[in-house]
């Protein structure tokens, strides 16, 4: 059964809507862990639209499970990661105009740069995951740059219309898991997962961790964060 990494970006989104001090994502991380979260994920974007540098610094000191820092592969972010020392880093694509991450990294198109970033971080004992589509060529490129993990982009699966298309996209993810395993890559997944579509992804062979945020934070507005996290844990375990 995969573990659950709770992404708390959207707690910060609510805070930044008013440029105030609440709700505090650090407090949300504590509640998520108490409810059974196996890890905490945050995306420190270049435009700082939600998570702020202060959040990452305090989370590094307070998270008791593990801290996954999502970031672009830029010199600024590498410097921050080396200073903060998260438990691992997930490199993600980033465009200022996007509402949320729109797809996986093009590792093939920037293989030399990715290899340099991966080497720099892993030399500092920070394992690196690459957020990529379940494309065989991209998975092979991830192995070539010596990443420890990949995180499969589940957005296309999540947006599939109808059972047939969803089944087709799930098979693409399964093939990605199989290819990654053959190359010695560990596999996480995330993006667009909800209480209604997560379980099939949790059942994929070799799946280690699911990073889920928006649906949990949305649910927490209605039932509270601890219950929302527990309910997602139940979904992953097949009890939901």
From Swiss-Prot:
3-amino-2-oxopropyl phosphate binds at residues 7, 18, 192, 213-214. Pathway: Cofactor biosynthesis; pyridoxine 5'-phosphate biosynthesis; pyridoxine 5'-phosphate from D-erythrose 4-phosphate: step 5/5. The record marks 151 as: Transition state stabilizer. It is an enzyme of class 2 (transferase). Its main location: cytoplasm. InterPro entries: Aldolase_TIM, PyrdxlP_synth_PdxJ, Pyridoxine-5'_phos_synth. The active site is at residues 43, 70, 191. It catalyses: 3-amino-2-oxopropyl phosphate + 1-deoxy-D-xylulose 5-phosphate = pyridoxine 5'-phosphate + phosphate + 2 H2O + H(+). One of its GO terms (molecular function) is pyridoxine 5'-phosphate synthase activity. It is found in: Cytoplasm. GO terms for cellular component: cytosol. 1-deoxy-D-xylulose 5-phosphate binds at residues 9-10, 45, 50, 100. GO terms for biological process: pyridoxine biosynthetic process. Catalyzes the complicated ring closure reaction between the two acyclic compounds 1-deoxy-D-xylulose-5-phosphate (DXP) and 3-amino-2-oxopropyl phosphate (1-amino-acetone-3-phosphate or AAP) to form pyridoxine 5'-phosphate (PNP) and inorganic phosphate. Belongs to the PNP synthase family. Homooctamer; tetramer of dimers. HAMAP family: PdxJ. This is Pyridoxine 5'-phosphate synthase. It comes from Acaryochloris marina (strain MBIC 11017). The gene is pdxJ.
């Amino acid at each position: 059964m995969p573990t659950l990494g709770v992404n708390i970006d959207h707690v910060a989104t609510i805070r930044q809507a008013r440029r105030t001090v609440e709700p505090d994502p650090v407090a949300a991380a504590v509640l998520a862990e108490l409810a059974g979260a196996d890890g905490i994920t945050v995306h420190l974007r270049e435009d700082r639209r939600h998570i702020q540098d202060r959040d990452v610094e305090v989370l590094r000191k307070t998270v008791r499970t593990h801290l996954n820092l999502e970031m672009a592969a830029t010199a600024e972010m590498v410097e921050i990661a080396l200073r903060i020392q998260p438990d691992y880093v997930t490199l993600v694509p980033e465009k200022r105009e996007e509402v949320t991450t729109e797809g996986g990294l093009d590792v093939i198109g920037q293989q030399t740069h990715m290899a340099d970033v991966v080497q720099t971080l892993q030399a500092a004992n920070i394992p690196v995951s690459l957020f990529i589509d379940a494309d065989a060529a991209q998975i092979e490129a991830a192995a070539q740059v010596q990443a420890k993990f990949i995180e499969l982009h589940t957005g296309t699966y999540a947006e599939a219309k109808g059972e047939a298309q969803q089944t087709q996209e799930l098979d693409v993810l399964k093939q990605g898991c199989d290819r990654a395993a053959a190359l010695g890559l560990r596999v996480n997944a995330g993006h667009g997962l909800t209480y209604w579509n997560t379980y099939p992804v949790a059942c994929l062979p070799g799946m280690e961790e699911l990073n889920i945020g928006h649906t949990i934070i949305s649910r927490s507005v209605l039932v509270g964060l601890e219950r929302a996290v527990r309910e997602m844990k139940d979904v992953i375990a097949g009890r939901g």
